[in-house]
């Protein structure tokens, strides 16, 4: 593992974060690696990390990680959620989902396990098997440690689980520190109230104890843990809207302001931060949400779940949300959290993971093209040339999901001879417009004719 050599000299230091080194003017091996992957200058990567506009989630205890970057200067990234639940799934199924997610292009993976076995064993196995950054929501295991009795949780319970995740090699954690007790009454006019699982746990704790959010009051302690291992904050949006009616409301925006304050507090200690966002947002409010986050959070990378642009399509929410995700990415969101067809209905299986990921790779790629990122359209142009030349195998190779493209083609024309045919089953051999090859010689003749007889052509029209 090459990265083992990179991090060996850092272990034991008080602060080993990428931001800490970047602010000292040091371009780490991870920054060089990211620069090569993004086709960007290493100094630009260092500068973006130093100012907090880019993060490289890279726990020093995750040596088999292939470093990647999340930030507006980099390509738009996609996260896939996996995780066992008490009612469904197990370790082997989750490892299979991890492999599938990586195969279909997940840039990071979050383990959201809430049951289904030994959570520490599941998490450790996922980290050891993963070349991509792993994120977690430690509040889930904190609740499991007290057998679901929210009121029994103490601040030390939260901190213990957070440190354990950091020691195990988790690269970023969702920390719901922006949900303050005074914000809870703001949800009373919502249709769906609080839809964040972590936020719901903390809300119950505050309602029972009538005390401030322990993740907020102990935020400095969490910073100290993150400094030691280079864990990045993914500041959770506990008050994200769970339906269009609740989008961009007072509760959501109040929490966002606090998330901005927490971002800057973490930066004071050179700890990396990204900020999570909605959710369910009408199309005409997506740009406002992205701009507002950049303003409140000093341009820390934005990481959104969707957003879904309509609430009436259960079973198709990978589509309703990919529409919003493409727009959010275009406006400057750095990472998109995928939504599967099972959203709101049940735990996704392997095929759901595949469908959700491909939908989001499409959204992220469309955003990269719209933002004119270097080389973003190269693959599109190459596939278009292959399509025009009826190079079917090359088209399949360049597709986001080569197996699905080949499968659909071969449903009607399975024989190998059709891989060189100048048609597909849509138009057949006589009606395919791409057979109309206008060569350079014919065009040159036409241009001469048009130049000579332009008036005559215009008159006849």
From Swiss-Prot:
Taxonomic superkingdom: Bacteria
UniProt-listed Enzyme Commission number(s): 4.1.99.17
Biological processes, Gene Ontology terms: thiamine biosynthetic process; thiamine diphosphate biosynthetic process
GO cellular component, one term: cytosol
Cofactor binding note: Binds 1 [4Fe-4S] cluster per subunit. The cluster is coordinated with 3 cysteines and an exchangeable S-adenosyl-L-methionine.
UniProt keywords, alphabetically: 4Fe-4S, Iron, Iron-sulfur, Lyase, Metal-binding, S-adenosyl-L-methionine, Thiamine biosynthesis, Zinc
Cofactor(s) in the UniProt record: [4Fe-4S] cluster
Pathway annotation: Cofactor biosynthesis; thiamine diphosphate biosynthesis
Coiled-coil intervals: none
Disulfide bridge map: none
Annotated catalysed reactions: 5-amino-1-(5-phospho-beta-D-ribosyl)imidazole + S-adenosyl-L-methionine = 4-amino-2-methyl-5-(phosphooxymethyl)pyrimidine + CO + 5'-deoxyadenosine + formate + L-methionine + 3 H(+)
GO molecular function, one term: 4 iron, 4 sulfur cluster binding
Binding positions (Zn(2+)): 280, 344
Binding site for substrate: 81, 110, 140, 176, 196-198, 237-240, 276, 303
Enzyme class, broadest EC rank: lyase
Function: Catalyzes the synthesis of the hydroxymethylpyrimidine phosphate (HMP-P) moiety of thiamine from aminoimidazole ribotide (AIR) in a radical S-adenosyl-L-methionine (SAM)-dependent reaction.
Family per similarity comment: Belongs to the ThiC family.
Protein name as catalogued: Phosphomethylpyrimidine synthase
Organism whose genome encodes this protein: Thermosynechococcus vestitus (strain NIES-2133 / IAM M-273 / BP-1)
Gene: thiC
């Amino acid at each position: 593992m090459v990265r083992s050599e990179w991090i060996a000299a850092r272990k034991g230091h008080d602060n080993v974060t990428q931001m800490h080194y970047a602010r000292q003017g040091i371009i780490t091996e991870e920054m060089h690696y990211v620069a090569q992957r993004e086709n960007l200058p290493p100094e630009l990567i260092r500068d973006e990390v130093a100012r907090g506009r880019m993060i490289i989630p890279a726990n020093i205890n995750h040596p088999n990680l292939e470093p990647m970057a999340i930030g507006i200067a980099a390509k738009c990234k996609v996260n896939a959620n996996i995780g066992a639940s008490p009612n469904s799934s197990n370790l082997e199924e989750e490892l299979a989902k991890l492999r599938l997610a990586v195969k279909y292009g997940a840039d990071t993976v979050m383990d959201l396990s809430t049951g289904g076995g030994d959570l520490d064993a599941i998490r450790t196995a996922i980290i050891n098997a993963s070349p991509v950054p792993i994120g977690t929501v430690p509040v889930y295991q904190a609740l499991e440690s007290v057998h679901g009795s929210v009121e029994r949780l103490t601040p030390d319970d939260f901190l213990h689980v957070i440190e354990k995740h950091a020691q195990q090699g988790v690269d970023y954690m969702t920390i719901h520190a922006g949900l303050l007790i005074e914000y809870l009454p703001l949800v009373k006019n919502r249709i769906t109230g609080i839809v964040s699982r972590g936020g719901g746990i903390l809300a119950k704790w505050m309602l029972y104890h009538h005390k401030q959010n322990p993740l907020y009051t102990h935020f400095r302690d969490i910073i100290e843990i993150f400094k030691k291992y280079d864990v990045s904050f993914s500041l959770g949006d506990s008050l994200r809207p769970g339906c269009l009616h609740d989008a961009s409301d007072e509760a959501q925006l109040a929490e966002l302001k606090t998330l901005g304050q927490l971002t800057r507090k973490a930066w004071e200690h050179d700890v990396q931060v990204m900020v999570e966002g909605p959710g369910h947002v009408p199309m005409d409010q997506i740009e406002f949400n992205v701009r507002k986050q950049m303003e409140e959070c000093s341009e820390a990378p934005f990481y959104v779940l969707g957003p879904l642009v309509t609430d009436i399509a259960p079973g198709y929410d990978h589509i309703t949300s990919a529409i919003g995700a493409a727009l959010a990415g275009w406006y400057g969101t750095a990472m998109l959290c995928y939504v599967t067809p099972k959203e709101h209905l049940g735990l996704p299986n392997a095929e759901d993971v595949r469908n959700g990921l491909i939908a989001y790779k499409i959204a992220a790629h469309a955003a990269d093209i719209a933002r004119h990122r270097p080389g973003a359209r190269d693959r599109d142009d190459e596939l278009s040339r292959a399509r025009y030349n009826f190079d079917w195998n090359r088209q399949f190779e360049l597709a986001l999901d080569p197996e699905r493209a080949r499968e659909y083609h071969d449903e009607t024309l399975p024989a190998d001879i059709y891989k060189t045919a100048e048609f597909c089953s849509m138009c057949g051999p006589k009606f395919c417009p791409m057979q109309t090859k206008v060569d350079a010689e014919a065009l040159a003749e036409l241009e001469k004719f048009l130049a000579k007889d332009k008036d005559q052509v215009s008159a006849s029209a």
